[in-house]
Amino acid sequence: MIKIYDTMTRSLRKFVPLTENTVNMYVCGPTVYNYIHIGNARSAVAFDTIRRYFEYTGYQVNYISNFTDIDDKIIKAATQAGVSPKELSDRFIAAFIEDTKALGVKPATQNPRVMDYIAEIISFVESLIEKDFAYEADGDVYFRVEKSEHYAKLANKTLSELEVGASGRTDAETALKENPLDFALWKSAKAGEVSWDSPWGFGRPGWHIECSVMATEILGDTIDIHGGGADLEFPHHTNEIAQSEAKTGKTFANYWMHNGFVTVDNEKMSKSLGNFVTVHDMLQTVDGQVLRFFLATQQYRKPINFTEKAIHDAEINLKYLKNTLQQPLTETADEQELKQFVIAFQDAMDDDFNTANGITVVFDMAKWINSGSYTEPVKSAFEKMLAVFGIIFEEEVLEVDIEALIAKRQEARANRDFATADAIRDQLAAQGIKLLDTKDGVRWLRD
């Protein structure tokens, strides 16, 4: 039984889907004006792991993750680069797909883009105005937060506690608002900016409305899970809830999940602090699976500190798991012990997707395998566990070919043909295969 820590209730809750055996989840994707950094990648990897575990347990997952392809930052970066916002966003969408593929992130069921939903956004805003939850002011449209009965409950705040500009975005039109906390649903166009015609004149969507529209258009008025980074809890997800529930009168999401930050020297990794490393740059020297494994070593809600040592440790541990998978199969293994490993793994992951505990089980199982318990069922169970973490090794050299060469080497040694035996060892070494001569015979490892 999977239990999820729900940010809205600040409690661990049993997962009950809206539709049996199906999970509909929406995860906020990147604003595509630059390469993603390791902190951004944490969200992609964390929710991909969550998706994979749902699939491991038999669920069908509809996984939606958007691209914000029009935004103040995109407009600014495009202007500086001398290209259109679409050209810039297309470039970094392609980069995001390439980077996350290297991290073993499965393609989303759908990746909606804001520019493809302008008509639906306008219709959504019109509905909010009709219901008196929104108002037009000089070409802008704002949401009335005071009409939202439980505004900011997700962030465990009250209206009186909130400060103007909590989102960190410049609010030059405060004088136009009925309440300084009201947020933009539609922004009037500035000279030279990309814009679309609307009942309120030319303009473009506000940031928060975009995800509400794409999520409900694709998954319906109520979804099972909405996820994203902890920094989106307020104001982004708070505002999504307010406008979505104002329009539909229904609960927007049944479970809210937020991943913790990647830190550097215990400070949040961010572009504003200048302490970030892009995935694109890291992949020049570090294998994508190593980065992914590093990000999985902590439970998704907890912060994880980025250090060279942590990356090095991930590389060593990943190599150990790879070598474990490549052990020769044995004829027997304790089926009851295998069952206990599977149960322990599921218990760990059922507890709010605790990857740290899940990985501990994986290493305990690897130790058991290396002690001589590696039948086909054991291998299958082990591979399925690793796949939850996105760890899938490609076979560079087929086992049957390796075993055939080892047999030839053994025959050469028996005939005291050491030149041939050494040549076979060198041939295997060139293919990344290391031979270990033991009293029980020859073992081999991928280097």
From Swiss-Prot:
Binding positions for ATP per the UniProt entry: 271
SUPFAM superfamilies found in the cross-reference section: Anticodon-binding domain of a subclass of class I aminoacyl-tRNA synthetases, Nucleotidylyl transferase
Gene name of the encoded protein: cysS
Predominant cellular place of this UniProt entry's protein: cytoplasm
Name assigned to this protein: Cysteine--tRNA ligase
EC number: 6.1.1.16
Species, as recorded: Streptococcus pyogenes serotype M3 (strain ATCC BAA-595 / MGAS315)
One biological process term in Gene Ontology: cysteinyl-tRNA aminoacylation
Assembly and binders: Monomer.
Gene3D superfamilies reported in the protein's UniProt record: Anticodon-binding domain of a subclass of class I aminoacyl-tRNA synthetases (1.20.120.640), HUPs (3.40.50.620)
Motif annotated as 'HIGH' region, chain positions: 30-40
Catalyzed reactions per annotation: tRNA(Cys) + L-cysteine + ATP = L-cysteinyl-tRNA(Cys) + AMP + diphosphate
Localization per Swiss-Prot or TrEMBL: Cytoplasm
Pfam families xref list: CysS_C (PF23493), DALR_2 (PF09190), tRNA-synt_1e (PF01406)
Family: Belongs to the class-I aminoacyl-tRNA synthetase family.
Gene Ontology MF annotations: ATP binding; cysteine-tRNA ligase activity; zinc ion binding
Cellular component GO terms held in the UniProt record: cytosol
Keyword DNA damage belongs to the record: no
Keywords recorded for this protein, A-Z: Aminoacyl-tRNA synthetase, ATP-binding, Cytoplasm, Ligase, Metal-binding, Nucleotide-binding, Protein biosynthesis, Zinc
The keyword Ligase is annotated on this UniProt entry: yes
The organism's taxonomic lineage, starting at the top: Bacteria, Bacillati, Bacillota, Bacilli, Lactobacillales
PANTHER family in alphabetical order: CYSTEINE--TRNA LIGASE, CYTOPLASMIC (PTHR10890:SF3), CYSTEINYL-TRNA SYNTHETASE (PTHR10890)
Enzyme class, broadest EC rank: ligase
Motif ('KMSKS' region): 268-272
Binding site for Zn(2+): 28, 211, 236, 240
Record text on cofactor binding: Binds 1 zinc ion per subunit.
Cofactor: Zn(2+)
